[in-house]
């Protein structure tokens, strides 16, 4: 399993969605699709006061050809949301990895 790296930015701590995708064995564009679905549900719900930016921050990166591509920065709550949708060994390992990383910062 690859190491999760904490990114300290915007006054918080985050993990890049590319790292999350690699750790959970999911293609990055599939994880982006899932995150976009979570965001859509949160935005459409009138029963909650959740701002999706508490979970996911839109970001981007440049690939090896110089193209700018989308990614997300996941807060601890964003990691928890992704982890709660996973099952089996990958879910357990990802949960253990992000909990350890964020707890190291406290």
Go through each PLM region and give its residues.
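An anion-engaging/catalytic patch
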Residues: 1-106
